[in-house]
Amino acid sequence: MKIVEIKHPLVRHKLGLMRICDISTKRFRELSSELGSLLTYVATDDLEVEIVTIKGWCGLVKIARIKGKKITVVPILRAGLGMMNGVLEHLPSARISIIGIYRNEITFEPIPYFHKLVSNINERMAMVLDPMLATGGSIIATIDLLKKFGCNNIKVLSIVAAPEGIKALEEKHPDIELYLASIDQKINKNGYIIPGFGDAGDKTFGTK
C-alpha cells in the first residue's frame, strides 16, 4: 500500500492548531477544509494531463489540461464532510458519493447505514475522505462497498492515523493509496487516536 505522510510546514502548522483542546467549531472546520485542500494537492500529483490549443488574448496558446479523469469524492459521514470543500476547491467538477457509517462504541465495529454512489463509479477514481484513521474499520467498510460496485481505483485522504489502523487497512486493501498529515502514536482503549484531536465529527459540527 502506498502511504504518503505529508510533512510540509503548512500541514504541520495547521495540524498543530487542530490539536488545541479548546479550539472553536468554526476554526476546526476551517482547518479541516484547508488540510483537505493540501492533501488533495499531493494526492492528485499523478493525474495525467494533455496539451490542447485554446484561443488566448494574444492568439492561439497551448495549455495543459487534466486528461479525461473521472473522479468521485467520497466523504464518510459525518466527519468527512469537514474536508470536502477543501478538496472541491481543486476538483470543482468532481461528482460526490456519500457513505454513512457509524462506529459501535462498545465493539468499535463499523455499521454502514446509508450510501448514495454516483453512476458509473466503476469508471472513476474515488477519493475517500475521513479525518481520522483509528482502527480502520470505517474506511475498510467504505472501500469494501466501493469495490463491491466495481470501483478499484481508490485513494484515502485522512488527517491523522494510528499505526494500528494503517496496518489493518494495508492487510485488507493493499492496493489503495493513503495520504495523511500525521501518523500518530496509537489508539487508546476507547478507540481514539493519541494524541489525535478528539472526535472530529463533534468538533466539526459542534456536538457532544
From Swiss-Prot:
Residues bound to 5-phospho-alpha-D-ribose 1-diphosphate: 78, 103, 130-138, 199
Activity regulation statement: Allosterically activated by GTP.
Cofactor requirements of the protein: Mg(2+)
Catalytic activity: UMP + diphosphate = 5-phospho-alpha-D-ribose 1-diphosphate + uracil
Record: residues binding uracil: 193, 198-200
A GO BP annotation: uracil salvage
Pathway: Pyrimidine metabolism; UMP biosynthesis via salvage pathway; UMP from uracil: step 1/1
Enzyme class, UniProt record, top EC level: transferase
Note on how the cofactor is bound: Binds 1 Mg(2+) ion per subunit. The magnesium is bound as Mg-PRPP.
Catalytic activity, EC: 2.4.2.9
InterPro entries in UniProt: PRibTrfase_dom (IPR000836), PRTase-like (IPR029057), Upp_B (IPR034332), UPRTase/APRTase (IPR050054), Ura_phspho_trans (IPR005765)
Transmembrane regions listed in the UniProt entry: none
GO molecular function, one term: GTP binding
Keywords, alphabetical: Allosteric enzyme, Glycosyltransferase, GTP-binding, Magnesium, Nucleotide-binding, Transferase
Function description: Catalyzes the conversion of uracil and 5-phospho-alpha-D-ribose 1-diphosphate (PRPP) to UMP and diphosphate.
Family matches, as PANTHER family: ADENINE PHOSPHORIBOSYLTRANSFERASE (PTHR32315), URACIL PHOSPHORIBOSYLTRANSFERASE, CHLOROPLASTIC (PTHR32315:SF4)
NCBIfam families with a match to the protein in the record: PRK00129.1, upp
Assigned protein family: Belongs to the UPRTase family.
Protein name per its UniProtKB record: Uracil phosphoribosyltransferase
Native organism: Blochmanniella pennsylvanica (strain BPEN)
